[in-house]
Structures are given as C-alpha cells and as structure tokens.
Amino acid sequence: MIEGIGIALQSYHDTAISAKAILESAIAQINANYIGAMLAEKTKEAKEIYNSTLAESRTENYDACLAILDEVAGQAKKIVEQPVPSDFISTLEALKQMKEPTKTEIETVVGAYKNNYFAYRAICDFLKLPKPVTVDVINDDIADIKSGLYKCFYSYNVEAYRFRNWIEGNILASYDEVFRAFCEGRFEDAVQSEQGKDDGIEAEKLNNNG
C-alpha cells in the first residue's frame, strides 16, 4: 500500500549517490585544467548542477511520498465513514441483556460486525476485548512516517544508517501491514499488525543504540 515510499527513497538515494560521483569527477577535472578565477567559477558551476539535481530529486520524491500517505489517510477516512449495519443496535442491546455471553456467542457477534469500524469498536468496548486500532492511531502513524521522511530527505545523509534503514529495514513494511489491514476493514488483523509494528520499531531503536 505504501511500497511506493520505498521506491521514492531508493530513487532519491540513487540520484544522490550518482550526483556525488559526477561532482567528484568534475571537480577532479576542473582542478587539473583550471587555476585562479576560472577554477573558482567552474567549481561553482559544478556544485550548482549538483545541488540542483539533488533538490529536484528531493522535491519530486518527497512529494510522491506525501501523496501516498494522503491517499492512505483518505482511504482510512472512508472506512470510518461507513454506516453501522441496520441490525447492529438491536444486536448490541440483546447482548447487553446477557449476564455472561459464551465464547461462541461472542465470536458470533464479533464475526458478524468485525469489518465495520464503529460496530467493531463498540463491541470491543462493551465486551472488554483487545482495544482496536482507531483512525487516530492511523493518523498518528502517518504523522510519524512524515516526520521520518522529512529527516530522510532534508537531514540524513543517504549513506547513513538511519536513511538506509528506511529502505533496507522493516519500518515501511510494518506500517504497510497496519494500513492495509485497517483500510480493508480487517480490524482484528490491524491490532496484531500495530503491535508487531511497535515491537519492530522498538527493536530497531535498540539495535541502533547498541
């Protein structure tokens, strides 16, 4: 769902590496062929081309990442906007009359409404089931990714571990599982994916600090 972000990061990485190599080669040739004011002018021109190439790739790929995340936010919003089934309220009222619903009864009710956001949330709250992933959690996750991407494009060196980890590590894949499950109405899976994502990110932090 957000695999395009990894592609955009890789594109920016490759452009930056290539532009750096071209700049270093150009500077070497300039140093070998020019002196004085001409040396300074040619060096300035080479660096301007390098910076322009980097800026163009940065803007293009960063904007592509933001567009992908905006699409996720839009899909999540549509999921939340889905109305509850017409029979849900009566079902919930009937459930409230039971002092001790059986495991099978609980599974039946959950199974009937597990793909509707508000119905599933209400059932989980009433039956004290594991707290579902809310749309606010999804929006917070999106904000976290945006923060990390800004650092990748505007702070981190593309050869640094923190940048490469966004491409080579499991960060994006972990978020992708959460977003995909939520936007497909698989709210039970979203809970597991969110926990797995949090555990994975915490492990990445420990490895980085170690």
Set out the residue ranges of the language-model regions.
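Core catalytic machinery and nucleic-acid-binding channels of phosphodiester-processing enzymes
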Residues: 1-22, 30, 182
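Long, charge-patterned amphipathic interaction tracts in eukaryotic proteins
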Residues: 1-11, 40-139
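Charged, low-complexity interaction regions
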Residues: 27-37, 135
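A long, low-hydrophobicity, low-complexity, charged/polar interaction segment common
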Residues: 85-210
